[in-house]
Amino acid sequence: MSPIEPRRFCNSVLSQYLECVTQACGRTIKM
């Protein structure tokens, strides 16, 4: 495995996690 693959995986997971957190924060603020 090249060292680039884990980074891409980590970045994709982090971006998805951040999106979920952002959406959750938006819902909490709206409520």
From Swiss-Prot:
Completely overlaps YBR141C. This is Putative uncharacterized protein YBR141W-A.
